[in-house]
Structures are given as structure tokens and as C-alpha cells.
Amino acid sequence: MKTPRLYTLLVLLLMAGGVTMQAQIRIDKQQCFGGFGQEFCVGMALEDDYILLVGNTARDYAGTGHVTQNCNESRPGDPCWIMKIDHDYEIIDNWCYGDMGFSDGVGFIFKIGDKNEYYLTGSGFPDICDNNAQNLNIVAKRINADGEVIWTRGFGTQMGLSYDHVANGELAHDGGLLCHANYHSGGCDISHYYGNGDGWIVALDSLGNMNWETTLGTLGQDNLYHVERSSRGGYLVTMTADPVGNNYGNLSPCSSSIPMNMNGLIVKLDDVGNVEWNACYGSTRENPEEGCGFNTVLELEDGGYICCGDAYGETGDLAGSGWHYGTLHNIPNGDLTTDAWLLRLDENRNVIWSKCYGGSNFDFSFKVFPMKDGGFMVFGATYSNNGDVASAAHLNLADENDSAGWVFRTDANGNLLWERCIGAVGNGQTYFKDVVQHNDREYTIAGIVRCASSAIYSGDIDCSNCAVTHNPDDPFGGRSLDYWILHITDTVDYTTLQVPERPMPKEEAVVEIYPNPTNNTVCVLLPNEAEATEMELINMSGQVVATKTFSGKGSWMEMGDLPKGMYMLRIRNAEVCLTRKVLRE
């Protein structure tokens, strides 16, 4: 394989605040795989001596490029395609399954214990429910490391999946498999349907037999996105919910103050799919243009949660989040664009902080990893070239682009430390789909890339296989989408990295905070008298440990009973809004 150029240092100018920092993401190696058609990689499995990349390939181009297998079965859709490579990204083998595949709703892979066997989940056309394989439904397989099928199962309804066609999954606590998708009808395998779109989960044992199934929904439109095993037993589910359906179904009502917006929803299930609790988060404005949703929720060591997804709005749980206003194609009064969104909750599911990241175009986050220092590493995508996305400058991303992969790092309070776009010059043309964390510094990413036709436009893309995937008979250059795998290393020196502050008026610069360090009390002296000044003391886990409101020019915070360490002191009134570090000795 070909080793790419190493990016040992990237200087990022953070536009919000004008703070210059050093962000060092090194691309250690990368490679691309595909045929002459479109290949969509959606997942991977990493083993000691091989890697499986899983997604789908264009049926009409099977047998071209690296797609050496012919998957032309009679069923419609693009087949699931698996590429087996070594850790130098050299090809070992590849194979496909023609009975499983449609758009990007195929090929999610899950390792089964310590066996070299795997579950695959996706969508296909199984012959179930007397529908004669006419509609898309859930398909699950169990395979070995050589692609041999141990069993295949299909589940669903006669009417088939809802519009998004995506069927995903998660390993069950008992070694089986959970499959989930969204449906607009009931019957057959689905025992309950509440109306207008529900999420459905079916649990299989290791032999592919159904253990249990459950529907999550209301009379409104409810969409299920992700299921995660809980370390406390049962499962955590992320959804979006429409509160118009609050009065019917198995989900507790969202707040009546959020009457028209799609809201982020977390649902806790027990081991057999019964709802234990659910919690809603989102906007409070009576405007259907505002909304939010979660792609992932993780449990943290302190008992709390971190959620990542996307959001657009400025009220409710999004108030003060820093959402960047934007509209689709910059059309005045057009549809609002989303930011990547992180929501930090305590053990009782109360909001600790809510932060948005992005620019004036669409930005998303789908994967978050807690760091040992309390911060978070986040992976997603961006179409923006402004706002927080200062690194778009190194790709010269156009206002209208095809998306760049985006990775950014925060501290424990959600403050952005650095960010990095990874893609091609001009149009980006890269999408992250799956990430495996090796440690706090190293990650393997699987995704999709459109190989550049010229080194001038390649940017971060440096695959030696691109020529193999180009169709020579295509008058437009044959630059189709391909599987993409890359290994990156975070080389930032966090001992010298400073948290960026928002721009401050000149009068804020003379706010006095003393003594600092302190072993008991910290005093605050403002430049002018204020009727109401709020102070919050926040620990490095992002928790507010003390609050106080005062009038006048000065006051103090007691810290003598707090553990020694670094804290963030946030001060806000009509003239002042700033955060400063305070050391408790």
C-alpha cells in the first residue's frame, strides 16, 4: 500500500474568538476499494490479522475494480459487499450477498464474542409475511471470517420498512443480536403499532430465533436511530419524537412546552424490551423548523451520559448552546441548517451543558468517545466553511460542497479545543461512517470517498488504488464513491493547549478574580455595578458545584469544602459574560 503525506502540524484559526491554536492530526495510512459503480461502506470489524469492511456495491458493476465477485441474484437492490484486508490495507479477499442490500441500509457488522464469526444486519427482500419478497424488511445473517453463511433470517411486516430503509443492530447481552428499524405499519412479526411511524426492535438468539420484539412509539412520528447496550443492564435507545402523539403509545409524554418540534429522545429498556424510562430534550419554540436528534448516547463513569447528534434552534435545551444560524443554500427564510450537538447529562438525566458546533451549513456528529481527561473526541461531517469549521480553509471548501469528514475535540465542559476537516480540495467528498478507538490518541475510520481525478484536488486523500476504481468508459471521469479506510493519530500537546474564550468587551478585561490559586475563598470584582450577576463554579467533569447571584460590584465564592483541583468560574450579567480558570489548592 501507499503511505500518505503526514500532516504533522495544522494551525487552526478559530474564527469565534480569534484564538490561534495548534491542532495536530496525523494521517498515518489510508486506502480505497471499489468497483466502477457506487460503493457505500457503513461498518468494519478489526481483528488481530485482518479487517472486514462492510457495505454495499452497485449490482450493475459487480466484477469491476476490486469487486471480483458476481452478486447478480434476481432480487432488486445493491448487494452487501465485504472487503477483507490486512493491517497494511492489502486485499485478502472479497465477497457479497445478493439477498441483502439497498442504499446505505446494509452491512452493519458485529463480532460474536471471541469467535471469528459475525452478525450482519441490514435491509433486503426476505420472503416473509406472505408478501412474496416485494417489500424491504430486516435481514440478519451470521457468517464466519471467510464469508460462509451460517444462517439468514428475515423479519418485518407485509408493508415493509418506512421511507429511510435503514435496518441496524446491536449485540444482545446474551450473545444474540438486536435488529432495529422504523416501520409505518404493524402485523406479521410486529405485534404493536401506534401510528404515523414507530421504531421496532427484534431480539434474536445465537441461532437466529426470535426471543422478543418491542415497538417504541406514540401517535406522532417517532424514529429510532441507535441501540446501545447499557452497563447497568438492558439497553439505551436514541430516537426523535413528535410530541403531537403524546397521549397514546408506550413512551412518556414530552413536555407540553415543545408542541410542534421533533425532539431528541432517550429510552431505557430492560433486558427483554420493556420501557423503564424515557427522557426528551429539545426546543421550546412553537416552530416546526426547530428540532434536534441523537445518534449516540453513552454512559459515563460518573453515572451520567453524553449524547451526540445534530440540532437547530436557540430555545429550551438549545438555549446558549452556540448554534450557528444558517439556511439551506443560504435562501432567505429557508429551512434551517443543523449543527453537531453534544448534550451532557448527570446521573438523573438533568442537563449539565448543551453545546453546538459548526457553521452556517449542515454539520453532524455520529460518534463520541470520552477521554481520560474528561473531554470528548467527536466524529461527524461538515458542509460548512465558516464558524467553528476554520480548518475548512486547508481544503478551500466551496460554499456548496459534498461534505468533508470532521473530527473535533472538547474539554470536559464542552469547550472546543480544536477541529479538523479531512477531505478533498474544493468539494470535500468524504464521509465517515464508522470509527474504532484504539486509545485516546489513535483511531481507525471507515467511510466513503470520491477519489480525486488529480493530485491538485486530492487534499487529504492519498489512495494508491483510485485508478483501479475509475471507469475508463465514463465520459465524466468515472469518479464513483468507494470504500475508504484510514488510521489517524492525535498528536496535540494538551499540557499547553488553552481553552478558547469568546470575544470580550474591553471592560471585561478588568474583572478581577483573586486570590487565584486559592485554598478557601475566591473574590470577584467587576468594573461596574450590576443589578444581578450570576456566578457558577464548574468542575472538570462539567458539573456545576456552586452557584451564586449578587448585586453591586463584588462578591465571593466559597471553595474550602471542594476537592483540590482546577475549576471553571463562569460570570454573567448584562455587560459581562466570561469564564476563567480557578485553582483550588
For the regions a language model picked out, list residue spans one by one.
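Serine/threonine-rich, low-complexity intrinsically disordered segments
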Residues: 5, 10, 22, 70, ...
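Residue-level detector of intrinsically disordered/flexible regions characterized by low predicted structural confidence
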Residues: 4-7, 86, 143-146, 252, ...
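C-terminal outer-membrane/trafficking sorting elements
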Residues: 503-514, 518-585
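Bacterial Sec-dependent N-terminal signal peptides
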Residues: 1-27, 499, 577-579
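A sequence-level/structural motif corresponding to short, flexible coil/turn segments enriched
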Residues: 22-503
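N-terminal processing/targeting junctions
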Residues: 15-16, 20, 60, 89, ...
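Intrinsically disordered, low-complexity regions enriched for glutamine and histidine
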Residues: 3, 20-22, 435, 541, ...
